[in-house]
C-alpha cells in the first residue's frame, strides 16, 4: 500500500508550484505542465519522493537516530510543531538561530540560560530582583522559549533533518550540508533540489499540503520507533536469558564443588 495517494495530494493542493517566471530550471524534471502562468508539479514524482523520504526517516528512527523538523514560515508552524510532538522528535518552528547546528555548544548554553530563568521563576528567586530586572528576565525567557522549546532536550546533532521550504530555511540547509546531515524536504518549483538528499517536489506554501506531507514523515518516524523498541526488547530478552544461563552455570559449579568436598 502506498504511503500517500495522488488523490490526497491533489485535494491538498500539493501540485501547485510558483509562477513560471520564478522557477528554478533544476526543477524541470519535477514539473508536469504550466497552467495560467503557474507551474504544475508532477504528483507521481511527489508520491515517489514521499515514499523515499519515508523509508529514509523510518530507517534513521529504527536505528535510534534523532530527527529534527524545521519550518518557520507561518503556513508550516502548526504542522511542524504538532507532527514533531506526535512523532516525539525535535523541531524549530519560529526562528532558525544561526549556528543552531554548526555552533551547537552555544545553543546548548542558551537552553541552559532559559532553564536557569525558569528555575528562578519556580523557586521565587526571580522576584528578589527589581521590577525592571524582572521584566528584563521575563522578556528574555519568552524569547528563548519561543526559539528553543522544540530543541531543549536535543543533546547532540540530529542524524537527519526534515525541512519545509529550503529557500526560507537557507541557513538550516547550509548548516546541515556543512555537517553532512542528510536532508529530506518539500521542494517547490522556485528551489534548488540539488541541495536536498531526499526531494519531495511539492507546494511548500499550502497549509494542507504541508500538513499532509509532514504527517507522513511523522508516521515514518513512529513506524521506525516501533522497530527500534522491538529490537531493544529482543536484546533485553536475550541478555536476560544469557544472565539466567550464567547464574545456572555458577550454581551448578558451586554444587559440584560442594559435592567434591
UniProtKB/Swiss-Prot annotation:
GO CC, alphabetical: cytosolic small ribosomal subunit
Pfam families: Ribosomal_S2
InterPro entries recorded: Ribosomal_uS2 (IPR001865), Ribosomal_uS2_bac/mit/plastid (IPR005706), Ribosomal_uS2_CS (IPR018130), Ribosomal_uS2_flav_dom_sf (IPR023591)
CDD domains in the record: RPS2 (cd01425)
GO-annotated molecular function: structural constituent of ribosome
One GO-annotated biological process of the protein: translation
UniProt KW keywords: Ribonucleoprotein, Ribosomal protein
Top-level taxon of the source organism: Bacteria
Gene3D superfamilies linked: Glucose-6-phosphate isomerase like protein, domain 1 (3.40.50.10490), Helix hairpin bin (1.10.287.610)
PROSITE patterns: RIBOSOMAL_S2_1, RIBOSOMAL_S2_2
Record-stated family: Belongs to the universal ribosomal protein uS2 family.
NCBIfam families referenced in this protein's UniProt entry, alphabetically: rpsB_bact (TIGR01011)
Protein name (record): Small ribosomal subunit protein uS2
Amino acid at each position: 500500500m502506498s504511503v500517500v495517494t495522488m488523490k490526497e495530494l491533489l485535494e491538498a493542493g500539493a501540485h501547485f508550484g510558483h509562477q513560471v517566471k520564478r522557477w528554478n530550471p533544476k526543477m524541470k524534471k519535477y514539473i508536469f505542465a504550466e497552467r495560467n502562468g503557474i507551474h504544475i508539479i508532477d504528483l507521481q514524482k511527489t508520491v515517489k519522493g514521499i515514499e523515499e523520504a519515508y523509508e529514509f526517516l523510518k530507517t534513521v528512527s529504527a536505528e535510534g537516530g534523532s530527527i529534527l523538523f524545521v519550518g518557520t514560515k507561518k503556513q508550516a508552524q502548526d504542522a511542524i510543531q504538532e507532527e514533531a510532538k506526535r512523532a516525539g522528535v525535535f523541531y524549530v518552528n519560529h526562528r532558525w538561530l544561526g549556528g543552531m547546528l554548526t555552533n551547537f555548544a552555544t545553543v546548548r548554553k542558551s537552553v541552559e540560560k532559559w532553564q536557569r530563568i525558569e528555575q528562578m521563576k519556580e523557586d521565587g528567586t526571580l522576584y528578589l530582583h527589581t521590577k525592571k530586572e524582572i521584566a528584563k528576565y521575563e522578556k528574555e525567557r519568552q524569547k528563548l522559549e519561543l526559539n528553543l522549546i522544540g530543541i531543549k532536550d536535543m543533546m547532540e546533532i540530529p542524524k537527519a533533518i526534515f525541512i519545509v521550504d529550503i529557500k526560507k530555511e537557507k541557513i538550516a540547509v547550509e548548516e546541515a550540508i556543512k555537517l553532512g546531515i542528510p536532508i529530506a524536504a518539500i521542494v517547490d518549483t522556485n528551489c534548488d533540489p540539488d541541495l536536498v538528499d531526499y526531494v519531495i517536489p511539492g507546494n511548500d506554501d499550502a497549509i494542507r499540503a504541508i500538513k499532509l506531507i509532514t504527517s507522513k514523515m511523522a508516521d515514518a518516524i513512529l513506524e521506525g520507533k516501533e522497530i527500534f523498541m522491538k529490537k531493544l526488547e529482543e536484546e533485553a530478552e536475550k541478555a536476560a536469558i544469557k544472565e539466567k544461563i550464567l547464574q545456572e552455570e555458577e550454581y551448578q559449579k558451586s554444587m559440584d564443588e560442594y559435592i567434591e568436598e
